[in-house]
Amino acid sequence: MKQIELQRHMEEVSLQFFQKEFRHRAVFNARLRTTGGRYLLKSHDIEMNPKYLENFGLEYFFGIMKHELCHYHLHLEKKGYQHRDKDFRELLKKVNAPRFCATIPREITMHEYTCENCGKSFLKQRRFNVNRYRCGSCGGKLKQLGSKKIYTENR
């Protein structure tokens, strides 16, 4: 999906679920890490996280759009637009939008090392030169076995 398509979808979702126009910009922001979208109070623009579209699909992404549009329309109407406000929670239920986003699993490369002397093995996120370090248990020489990818929750 491109910026133009995102803008068009945002306008369509706004008309379909809120019966109101979306008159500002909707843009992708790949720097967003732990949130699906963000409503900007000063400019009234909405930033969306493209990773949620890739990981969870268009249906879930439309849910995030509805959530951000709840912030947008309530703020412009000078009603309670924050998560804790009653107006916001009621509008979320009315349009069937999620209150919070699911977390995107993070991909981490782990490097596996083993001691040639005692056989102890361990995982590290950072690679290091095995010639410069020794085993902490027995002082033996270390050997890199390889690396593997692990998926974890964002913090």
From Swiss-Prot:
List localization entries: Cytoplasm
Q: Where does Zn(2+) bind?
A: 67, 71
Instruction: Tell me where on the tree of life, at the top rank, the source sits.
Output: Bacteria
Q: Which cofactor does it need?
A: Zn(2+)
CC per GO annotation: cytoplasm
> What keywords would UniProt list here?
Cytoplasm, Metal-binding, Zinc
| Family in the record | Belongs to the SprT family.
Q: Any idea what this protein is called? A: Protein SprT-like
